[in-house]
Amino acid sequence: MNNLKVNYLIILVITLLATMVIGFNVRWPNTQDSQINRIISQGELRISAVSSPLIYIDEQKQLRGFDYELAQGFASYLGVKLKITIRPNFEQIFDDLENGDADIAVAGLLYNKERLAKTKTGPSYLNVTQQLVYRKGTTRPKSFNDIDGKLLVTSGTAHASTLKELAKEYPNLKWEETSQYTTNQILEMLADGEIDYTLEDSIAIALQQRIHPQIAVAFDLLDDHAVTWYMRRSQENSLDAALLDFFNLSNESELLARLNEKYFSHVESFDYFDTMAFIKAIDNKLPDYQPLFEKYAQEIDWKLLAAIAWQESHWDPLATSPTGVRGLMMLTKPTAATMGIADRLDAEESIKGGAAYIAYIMDRLPESIAEDDRIWFALSAYNMGYGHMQDVRKLTEMLGGDPNRWFDVKARLPLLTQKKYYSQLTYGYARGHEAYRYVENIRRYHQSLVGYLQSRERKQHTLDIAQKSLTYLISPDNLKTTGANPTENQSPITEKVSIKNLGAMSSSNQTPKIHNMEKLSLGHYLISPYSLQDETETDNPVPVPPLKSPDNPL
């Protein structure tokens, strides 16, 4: 019997060791010529991407977005640098895969079986719905039979493939495809009335509705679609295994959940009238106060300070609430006194005091709070008080969450109204649900303001170019006929060229190319696990979310 027990023990030990070895080999089939071995030996993960709602370049020329941070996390997990090449269209990123110029294609891409002959996909990490959108104020189609106008989609996408399938059911369905416009540009064209319909995913639509509230959803397609990364098809699966391992760890560490909260949670609901009122106020009211927001914003983005003020008072310097808070930043008397503000109804004084108070709160926050999250903790304290903010952090820890992550803490804010929770806390009852909505609203307004100002700047830039071109065309210096009357020669040209409708000068089958400014700085970005840089300039460091594994204790 003892020998039998020993034999069982030996078998168990051998089985465990074999399982460990096999498990590592399945996860990391690291032969000398494997793709993952090449990536690690070269010290570089090559990503080919298209500007999209999931990966983009912000105002500071920094790469941002869900896909960007995820790619950065994967490169950090492998212990290599990240090289991202931004391409102008989807076809080029798949060409990069086929030609061996990229390891992974990233662009908020939906699973598309038409691509599987030459590519394969990694794990899916988001689910979206394809939606047909139209311009608010026009007739809402109830099905594809009701399409009456120009339907435009980006070529090479799952949306184009979907329309090809739908054409079998709707033989009269017509559409156009283009590789010259980004997702955001097509949605902007729809908002401006240049096209009538497009098919897009629910995330892109939700984000752009904050900037162009005229975008309206006609109906959803029934099936959800997975968002995924693409790789070149081959018999060698080492990169697939590494990706699967990384995504499993990302789920365990809640990296995916945190990124979803950071980029998308605040746009889950949409109020057309509220957004329209805000957009109109950007044009009509903001110019009066923008210099003051810029002057006193200190360490935060002035547009975020403006969004806070809109949430507080709708940019009304005389606003007063029943609780006694007053002014554009709705300061209490004690707060105003602490910040040295004598007149809360003076717009400049109010903005100065509000900005100073936010900076004061930020300085008081524990250093353990993640950098990206500090402003949201500060805003919750601005709304309900610093003590209640500390209480909800304590409650979060009591309930097993991370008190230093806004993702965990905001979920517990509504619990401050429940006696079984607030009775255990230092400062007691608080309207935590209001603080939750307060922060989410500010995030939405900030996103709307940033996006709308960028869109307006691009349009003005295009208009300026058109005006310069028109001036050149009709300038007397450019008239070729000697002695011709300038006014006689200018008139016909002026009548033919409409600045508003310059796009109409192009053939309907040839869409104009994207201007360099609108391509969002196409090019190469070489990123180490702890910094972001292009090939000639080094920018500010970008923190990488930590991911750990038994083999990769980074």
Role assignments for model-derived ranges:
Residues 51, 124-135, 202, 206-245, ...:
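Periplasmic-binding protein-like
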